[in-house]
């Protein structure tokens, strides 16, 4: 069955182009031109992903994401923001609110499809079984092994979960609260500074291969896992 994608975009030419590209790549697009019509599309069959413009008649994309996250049936639907707002502050705000990725207009159809597929791989249950590799660092979820080249790295279960999350969500900034929700879960009470402790332990575990540099502190915001030093 084709993956169902809700396209929330008020500019008809862009919306129609995106829907055409999605259909050509085997997706099932569903259109919404404003905030209210997008909310009305949130019913069964649920969208597998939402492409969301920042500015909408009747409300903003940020408000729409907050609406999604309040409802148990929609909070886990991945969101890719599709907007002309390209400033770092705007990107960080979108991601911190709950967007899974961010595409700045103008964009190419190939980039759009590639980013959609990347987000869907991250949320797919099958994806968690694949070995993840980045610059000589590999993580195998099945065997619970982390390697730098041919050498195994030792780390605790929480550091492993933290690294797994980072490696499946690279080049994005996450606040301590977001990391707590993703790695520890929303039903566990843990202080924000606990994240700092496990970040230090993770960096220590990654030192033998020099991969500790990939766990980067973003001052005033949180942490990012990046191959760009």
From Swiss-Prot:
Alphabetical keyword list: Activator, Cytoplasm, DNA-binding, Phosphate transport, Phosphoprotein, Transcription, Transcription regulation, Transport, Two-component regulatory system
Subcellular location: Cytoplasm
Gene3D superfamilies to which the protein is assigned, alphabetical: 3.40.50.2300, 6.10.250.690, Winged helix-like DNA-binding domain superfamily/Winged helix DNA-binding domain (1.10.10.10)
GO biological process: phosphate ion transport; regulation of DNA-templated transcription
An example Gene Ontology CC term for this record: cytosol
Protein name: Phosphate regulon transcriptional regulatory protein PhoB
Gene this protein is translated from: phoB
Modified residues (4-aspartylphosphate): 53
DNA-binding region: 129-227
InterPro entries: CheY-like_superfamily (IPR011006), OmpR/PhoB-type_DNA-bd (IPR001867), Sig_transdc_resp-reg_PhoB (IPR011879), Sig_transdc_resp-reg_receiver (IPR001789), WalR-like (IPR039420), WH-like_DNA-bd_sf (IPR036388)
Domain Response regulatory: 4-120
GO molecular function, one term: transcription cis-regulatory region binding
Post-translational modification: Phosphorylated by PhoR.
Biological role: This protein is a positive regulator for the phosphate regulon. Transcription of this operon is positively regulated by PhoB and PhoR when phosphate is limited.
């Amino acid at each position: 069955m084709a993956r169902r994608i809700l396209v929330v975009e008020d500019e008809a030419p862009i919306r129609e182009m995106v829907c055409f590209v999605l259909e050509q790549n085997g997706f099932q697009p569903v259109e919404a031109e404003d905030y209210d019509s997008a909310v009305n599309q949130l019913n069964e069959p649920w969208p597998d992903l939402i492409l969301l413009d920042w500015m909408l008649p009747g409300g903003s994309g940020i408000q729409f994401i907050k609406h999604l996250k309040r409802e148990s049936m929609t909070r886990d639907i991945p969101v890719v923001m599709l907007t002309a707002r390209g400033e770092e502050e705007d990107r960080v705000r979108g991601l911190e609110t709950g967007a899974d990725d961010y595409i700045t207009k103008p964009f190419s159809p190939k980039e759009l499809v590639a980013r959609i597929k990347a987000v869907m791989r991250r949320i797919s249950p099958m994806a968690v079984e694949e070995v993840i590799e980045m610059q000589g660092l590999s993580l195998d979820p099945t065997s619970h092994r982390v390697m730098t080249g041919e050498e195994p790295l030792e780390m605790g279960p929480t550091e492993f979960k933290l690294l797994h999350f980072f490696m499946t969500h690279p080049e994005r900034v996450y606040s301590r609260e977001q990391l707590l929700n993703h790695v520890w879960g929303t039903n566990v009470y843990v202080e924000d500074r606990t994240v700092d402790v496990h970040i230090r332990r993770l960096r220590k575990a990654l030192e033998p291969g020099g991969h500790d540099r990939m766990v980067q502190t973003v001052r005033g915001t949180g942490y990012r896992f990046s191959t760009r030093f």
